């Protein structure tokens, strides 16, 4: 694990921290595809990361932000909302509540994110367009959990194709905000665990060195670092870290047992100790959506069912 003792020697401190804004601006101005890992229900971390992305210092460095928490079926609706048109909260909620992985987006930080983008777009020289790359579909057409799983497995490919299409049209860099495991550049070294290629693996193949992946610190412990910032993973103190040292919940088998950290991600974003906010108290779902979410309970797993029931009760 990362050394959190007060006796850690200065020589064991991580080096080369870059301020997030400087890092992002440099990569985006060079035309890179910057993929930032997101941890579901880590709302404070989400808000800090997106605060950096929406900062005025990055105005003009990118115009398109690709996200996974939205069904592409509702792209036009989101475009209208972000451009300032009148859209009710119940209508806008279709963007993330009609997502394949909607239980992951029930925390209000995701819906509030669109409000924040709309607000900053009113003052930006280059407004941010949010691109929903999850395959377009209707829940009415999903009759079995296997159909949902098949659709979910298509998300990485759809995201990679969407980003490739945009980069071919525009010289600006592109930002991708997606679940952290999706940004990994390699398949598991234990082959039987690789169900399909991650977005990161596809992006590495398509964009080469122009693909830059940034893993966020999602542990409740301190990192042996002198300051918050983004650290390159090719330095010795990070390069040899195990994948298991990046995640709070340890699987029984390390799927990347023989892979160095710098082969998985290019940089590590440290914003201090983080915790998952799983408390559903205060989460408000528009009434018209409660019945719809209840109808989907048979299609999701037990853990997701538990979260949904807590939110709609």
Give the location of each predicted region.
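Compositional signal for N-terminal targeting/processing segments
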Residues: 1-313
């Amino acid at each position: 694990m990362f050394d959190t003792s007060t006796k850690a020697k200065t020589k064991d401190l991580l080096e080369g921290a870059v301020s997030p804004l400087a890092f992002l601006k440099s990569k985006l101005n060079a035309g890179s595809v910057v993929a930032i890992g997101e941890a579901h229900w880590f709302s404070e971390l989400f808000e800090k990361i997106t605060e950096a992305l929406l900062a005025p210092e990055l105005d003009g460095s990118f115009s398109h932000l690709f996200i996974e928490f939205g069904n592409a079926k509702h792209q036009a609706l989101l475009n209208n909302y972000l451009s300032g048109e009148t859209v009710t909260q119940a209508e806008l909620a279709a963007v993330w509540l009609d997502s394949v992985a909607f239980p992951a987006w029930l925390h209000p930080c995701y819906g509030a994110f669109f409000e924040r983008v709309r607000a900053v777009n009113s003052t930006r020289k280059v407004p941010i367009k949010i691109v929903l790359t999850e395959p377009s579909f209707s829940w009415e057409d999903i009759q079995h959990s296997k159909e949902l799983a098949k659709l979910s497995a298509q998300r990485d490919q759809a995201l990679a194709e969407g980003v490739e299409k945009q980069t071919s049209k525009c010289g600006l860099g592109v930002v991708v905000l997606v679940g952290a495991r999706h940004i990994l550049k390699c398949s598991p070294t234990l082959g039987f665990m690789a169900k399909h290629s991650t977005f990161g693996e596809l992006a590495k193949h398509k964009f080469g060195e122009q693909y830059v992946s940034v893993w966020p610190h999602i542990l409740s412990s301190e990192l042996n670092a002198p300051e918050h910032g983004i650290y390159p993973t090719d330095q010795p103190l990070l390069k040899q870290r195990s994948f298991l040292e990046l995640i709070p919940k340890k699987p029984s088998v390390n799927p990347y047992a023989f892979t160095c950290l710098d082969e998985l991600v290019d940089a590590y974003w440290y914003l201090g100790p983080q915790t998952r906010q799983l408390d559903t108290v205060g989460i408000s779902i528009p009434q018209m959506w409660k019945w719809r979410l209840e109808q989907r309970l048979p299609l999701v797993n037990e853990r997701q069912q538990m979260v949904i029931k807590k939110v709609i009760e």
